[in-house]
Swiss-Prot record:
Part of the 50S ribosomal subunit. Homodimer, it forms part of the ribosomal stalk which helps the ribosome interact with GTP-bound translation factors. Forms both a pentameric L10(L12)2(L12)2 and heptameric L10(L12)2(L12)2(L12)2 complex, where L10 forms an elongated spine to which the L12 dimers bind in a sequential fashion. The proportion of heptameric complexes increases during cell growth. One of its GO terms (molecular function) is large ribosomal subunit rRNA binding. One of its GO terms (cellular component) is cytosolic large ribosomal subunit. It comes from the Archaea. NCBIfam families: PRK04019.1-2 (NF003096), PRK04019.1-5 (NF003098). The gene is rpl10. This is Large ribosomal subunit protein uL10.
Length: 335
């Protein structure tokens, strides 16, 4: 708390203000410094209304905010918090919230609104006046338009702009006369709002450049990373809750392919092995001359008949089981 010293008496309202700021700084886990220097009063009130339920915004003198931040850092034993003052700029204000820094930045960015450009300001982009009626009756405004280089004339009883015209290019200074004309035409080339200077969370201070991300690009990178990690897990056979089913299915398919290729018969591969053998038989028969084939084979070759799937006689099953038992058990256990 600020203590009044004999040689320099501090105004009571300043002490109260610093204490109120300290209370605000201690009330939330996320503290942000924002720049509101160029925000007109009307837009500022609109922004306040938009964010009122999500965060607390408090304006004060920079010297008092600096004092409050430093005292809170000292009282809480948190020197990292004191570094927030390094991001303070003209027209700064404090925001206290529980919203994470990225969501806070997005919310503030979305709360920005278009505004008229001021005379003497630097054009943020090429400012163009479109052709068409201004809706204004003949009068002095016609001369004002022409004075700033906008081709205008009376059209159907109203002042109209003859053609599209770029009146100032990006980076150029907007004259006072042009600013008045653009405002009268309701052209708002400037976006105003609360700009993030620094956001403190758990010992880390984020700047606007840290928080300004392309969401589509960011999500795309996460999806790509997930796909790469998923494929690595499957191919390296490192089971996780997300990949175990795919790994088991891949192992099953690989084992089944080996079984079919090596003609190792199981209840899961018998049909595929028979189908393959049948197809090979038809292919070989097709290479033989007609004299070597009976009528049945000739008919099957000409019709491209599919391999028949026949049920084995009951009495043959016992013998098949004996043959399977004599085969290597390892492969059969996979099915």
């Amino acid at each position: 708390m600020i203590e009044a010293k004999s040689e320099h008496k501090i105004a009571p309202w300043k002490i109260e203000e610093v204490n109120a700021l300290k209370e605000l700084l201690k009330s939330s886990n996320i503290i942000a410094l924002i720049d509101m220097m160029e925000v007109p009063a009307v837009q500022l009130q609109e922004i306040r209304d938009k964010i009122r339920d999500q965060m607390t915004l408090k304006m004060s003198r920079n010297t008092l905010m600096k004092r409050a931040i430093e005292e809170v850092a000292e009282e809480t034993g948190n020197p990292e918090f004191a570094k927030l003052v390094d991001y303070m700029d003209k027209g700064a204000a404090i925001i206290a919230t529980e919203m994470n820094p990225f969501k806070l930045y997005k919310t503030l960015d979305e709360s920005k609104s278009p505004a008229p450009v001021k005379g003497g300001a630097i054009a943020p982009c090429d400012i163009e006046v479109k052709a068409g009626s201004t809706g204004m009756p003949p009068g002095p405004f016609l001369s004002e338009l022409k004075a700033v280089g906008i081709p205008a004339a009376i059209d159907k009883g109203k002042i109209g702009i003859k053609e599209d015209k770029i009146v100032v290019k990006e980076g150029e200074v907007v004259s006072q006369k042009l600013a008045v004309v653009l405002s009268a035409l309701d052209i708002k080339p400037v976006t105003v709002g609360l700009n993030v200077l620094g956001v403190y969370e758990d010992g880390v201070i984020y700047t606007e450049s840290d928080l300004k991300i392309d969401e589509e690009e960011f999500v795309g990178k996460i999806q790509k990373a997930y796909t790469s990690a998923f494929n690595l897990s499957v191919n390296a056979v490192i089971p996780t809750s997300a990949t175990v089913e795919t790994i088991v299915q891949k192992a099953f398919n690989d084992a089944k392919a080996v079984s079919v290729e090596s003609a190792f018969v199981t209840d899961k591969t018998a049909d595929a092995i028979l189908g393959k053998a049948y197809a090979q038989m038809i292919a070989v028969a097709g290479l033989a001359g007609d004299d070597a084939l009976d009528e049945d084979l000739k008919g099957k070759i000409s019709s491209g008949a599919a391999a028949p799937v026949e049920e084995a006689p009951v009495e043959e099953k016992k013998e098949e089981k004996k043959e399977e038992a004599a085969a290597p058990a390892g492969l059969g256990m996979l099915f």
